[in-house]
């Protein structure tokens, strides 16, 4: 029997001042999670503690009337909601509400294949929900609780105790998995295998380049976060044998809960010998620069500041030939100020294979410790 797609209407609540590409990204994230955006509301934050003005909240409640009673419907606030603001919105609209962190975690759940990825996602979700549950307990004592994260489930107090216990258990299990990963890395290093971590903004073509380099056919697509669990492959090229690792993509303003929960995944970059940073150069210059800046800042946040870094300027098949040199200089200028260990910018196309041989040659030269480059 064929599956029937569930109708998941949503209202997207966006802060004013986002760049056009960030607005597009918000729509893409909502759609990737399976939501159909039926309306949008723009707002300006009232204060640090209050997201929506009373007038904006009334406007949102009016827009949401058609969604009331639909268990699949969501109000998606493209910001990080504080507990009091979360319940304020739910009470006014009567519609289940998620914020940006919850949305990203829903997408992660769709692509999580490994036990570790599922645990990391659950840990991030529980940590994010914990303050909401504390606020729910406070409101329940005041008899002002409008409903919390959908119908059914545990009584609030019992659920809070369960969450605390579950977080502790997941952290223990992830520590054990992290220990095993470290043992595996040590074995590969003992065998003399350098590690190349492929990183970059979501949907830049990291997995496509990983496939082009390794000859594998891992799933790729235009949607965000197709890679949640790192993929590893040892290959030989230019007289060397190395391990390439495809990692989870970066995104603007990565929530701290996600960085912390995915520490062992992001650690692949921190322990690599070379960072291969993939950039989509088919986008406008300002978008390229902003995404590169965000990604490099994320690397710094996880302690990657002195690893040799090569930028793969990807998707040159979508760029006029005469623009490639200019884009290369743009990336060199933007990256070198933030990341002094930048080694090179190599134009490539993961789709056609153009430039991949030169990229591998440059990596081999770097690993061999050769000064300069003959590539």
UniProtKB/Swiss-Prot annotation:
**The protein's assembly and partners:** Monomer. Associates with the 50S ribosomal subunit.
| Localization per Swiss-Prot or TrEMBL | Cytoplasm
InterPro entries linked to this entry:
G_HFLX_dom, GTP-bd, GTP-bd_M, GTPase_HflX, GTPase_HflX_N, GTPase_HflX_N_sf, P-loop_NTPase
Q: What is this protein called?
A: GTPase HflX
> Sorted alphabetically, which keywords does the UniProt record give?
Cytoplasm, GTP-binding, Magnesium, Metal-binding, Nucleotide-binding
What GO cellular-component annotations does this UniProt entry give? cytoplasm
Tell me where in this chain the Hflx-type G domain is found. Answer: 194-371
User: What is the documented function of this protein?
Assistant: GTPase that associates with the 50S ribosomal subunit and may have a role during protein synthesis or ribosome biogenesis.
Q: What residues bind GTP, as annotated?
A: 200-207, 225-229, 246-249, 314-317, 349-351
One Pfam family linked to the record: GTP-bdg_N
| Taxonomic source organism | Hyperthermus butylicus (strain DSM 5456 / JCM 9403 / PLM1-5)
PANTHER family (alphabetical): GTP-BINDING PROTEIN HFLX, GTPASE HFLX
Q: What gene is it encoded by?
A: hflX
Q: Which family does it belong to?
A: Belongs to the TRAFAC class OBG-HflX-like GTPase superfamily. HflX GTPase family.
Upper classification of the organism: Archaea, Thermoproteota, Thermoprotei, Desulfurococcales, Pyrodictiaceae
Which positions in this protein are listed as binding Mg(2+)? 207, 227
Q: Which GO terms describe its molecular function?
A: GTP binding; GTPase activity; metal ion binding; ribosome binding
